[in-house]
Amino acid sequence: MKKEEYLEKVALANLWMRAYYEKDEPLASDEEYDALIRELRVFEEQNKDEISKDSPTQKIAPTIQSEFKKIAHLKRMWSMEDVFDESELRAWAKRAKCEKNFFIEPKFDGASLNLLYENGKLVSGATRGDGEVGEDITLNVFEIENIPKNIAYKERIEIRGEVVILKDDFEKINEKRALLNQSLFANPRNAASGSLRQLDTSITKERNLKFYPWGVGENTLNFTKHSEVMQFIRELGFLKDDFVRLCANLDEVLKAYDELLVLREKKPMMMDGMVVRVDDLALCEELGYTVKFPKFMAAFKFPALEKTTRLIGVNLQVGRSGAITPVAVLEPVNLDGVVVKSATLHNFDEIARLDVKINDFVSVIRSGDVIPKITKVFKERREGLEMEISRPKLCPTCQSELLDEGTLIKCQNIDCEDRLVNSIIHFVSKKCLNIDGLGENIVELLYKHKKITTLESIFHLKFNDFEGLEGFKEKKINNLLNAIEQARECELFRFITALGIEHIGEVAAKKLSLSFGKEWYKQSFEAYANLEGFGEQMALSLCEFTRVNHTRIDEFYKLLNLKIEKLEIKSDGVIFGKTFVITGTLSRPRDEFKALIEKLGGKVSGSVSKKTDYVLFGEEAGSKLSKAKELEVKCIDESAFNELVKE
């Protein structure tokens, strides 16, 4: 079997596997599927360097489904900014305007979980998802022994933390899987994530998962320090790691980091760094967020594990923008439970800087524990068999002449197959138009048969375009066509994300959608640059893209019926620009009051400070009302609030 035939069989096996396990609509008999898997295993045993990461023999998709209901978080689950050394930590602290009183704790390498409690009872559990909406895994959460199902606190509260698998338990799980001839988990993080997303809750239960809280989302707590919040949460019955402390200054933070780094191998669970957070909640509220991160906390990452291997070749990848990226082909090396066979070389200027050659021994790390990269070349170990890595002159895909601008080498052929295919794959991906069933292999198959050649051509596909293609039967074709039709009515921000504009990701796309609606591509440089979290680089990228693609976006609007979320804010009322805190029991849910305040241009905070303008209180208002009176903040009941919003 040749490589091309092997990859075609991988695609077919995945098609059959998804149909059987995810859609419950078999496209082949059990005997045919088993025979195909045996063919793949024979090839892979003989060609270990050619194994596709997409092969069904390399993953456990049949037991990990994506068929969970979606559940919205009451408050967004943010990512964290990463810092990797002392200078970056000090730069972060300077931006955070904080030089003292930091809360620190280990950053466990697991799966984030959001728990919702109401009236003291656990009512739901959800994965992080996209930060705003996660997967409803409540049934599995109830199988995690150390998560309290009832707590003494009766107000509604979201408690967030990390689900981990202990290293010893991870080894036992893999030993059991090996005995069952099942593929092994690469690391405890993947095992924890997979264990949470089981359709069979008994599997989750037997995995012995542990939950460590690290924060809260929606809450009505009245503390002034994050450390007080966490102490309260742990007193409700949650686990506390023994390395949690307050640091008076950055020097103490650095000392704690060094201590924790020494404990890295001794800890029973995987860690990839230390969380550093401003402890003062009022300052946290003042600092706020970028479009992606809270400004008041950072992940001080550990140095990635580093190993030596040999560079045996260089592959050239053509991105959807045409940029040529050299990728080092490595002799396989295990880094922190992950077998690494390739590493980024970024660009040819980086190759020159490293003075790296084919057959060199190199040091490779997983930068940020995610992307493998080469950091050092051991020139003293050269044996005379090394070969220079030449700058390419022709595109490896279409053979057209490349534009060499130094750092950037680019294929300018807009019809280059790799550019088009990668653009289409991105366009239909989960975070973009999310066309179910139109994955990477299917896109490549359709492009190969000239059924799709542009982004727009996706919406012109017909039933007869699929007839005769391997693996497609009537029901499968109709399902895919229905998914394409549904994608015509996707959210505007998904469409903006799908266009692949440089520097504009999902978060920025949502900001554009909310700020400008359907007119997002008709704005000025100043309008873009003035958006919160944007800057000159993003604004320039948007201006250039919209200038070139203005007419094309108009044409897309004729093909699509985009859902547009527009946040209408009244800017001439007495509430505009005012900060509210809501406490006590009101006649309607707090979310309704919050939505009204925000619509009128106000802001709702979770804690009372000198910057609070109004406290809206109801029955059984607690310490927030008392604190507001101490600070002489204006306190109004529901009747006074109703009069205020009429003005």
From Swiss-Prot:
Gene3D superfamilies documented for this protein: 5' to 3' exonuclease, C-terminal subdomain (1.10.150.20), BRCT domain (3.40.50.10190), DNA ligase/mRNA capping enzyme (3.30.470.30), Helix hairpin bin (1.10.287.610), Nucleic acid-binding proteins (2.40.50.140)
SMART domains membership: BRCT, LIGANc
Cellular component annotations (GO), alphabetically ordered: cytosol
InterPro entries to which the protein is assigned, alphabetical: BRCT_dom, BRCT_dom_sf, DNA_ligase, DNA_ligase_AS, DNA_ligase_CS, DNAligase_adenylation, DNAligase_N, NA-bd_OB-fold
Catalytic activity: NAD(+) + (deoxyribonucleotide)n-3'-hydroxyl + 5'-phospho-(deoxyribonucleotide)m = (deoxyribonucleotide)n+m + AMP + beta-nicotinamide D-nucleotide
Binding residues annotated for NAD(+), in chain numbering: D30, E31, E32, Y33, D34, S79, M80, E105, R128, E162, K301
Active site residues of this protein: K107 (n6-amp-lysine intermediate)
GO molecular function: DNA ligase (NAD+) activity; metal ion binding
Residue span(s) of domain BRCT: 570-647
GO biological process, one term: DNA repair
Binding of Zn(2+), residues: C395, C398, C411, C416
Keywords, in A-Z order: DNA damage, DNA repair, DNA replication, Ligase, Magnesium, Manganese, Metal-binding, NAD, Zinc
Enzyme class: ligase
EC number: 6.5.1.2
Cofactor: Mg(2+); Mn(2+)
Domain of life where this protein originates: Bacteria
Keyword DNA repair found: yes
HAMAP family according to UniProt: DNA_ligase_A (MF_01588)
Role this protein plays: DNA ligase that catalyzes the formation of phosphodiester linkages between 5'-phosphoryl and 3'-hydroxyl groups in double-stranded DNA using NAD as a coenzyme and as the energy source for the reaction. It is essential for DNA replication and repair of damaged DNA.
Family named by the database record: Belongs to the NAD-dependent DNA ligase family. LigA subfamily.
Protein's name according to its UniProt entry: DNA ligase
Protein source organism: Campylobacter jejuni (strain RM1221)
Gene responsible for this protein: ligA
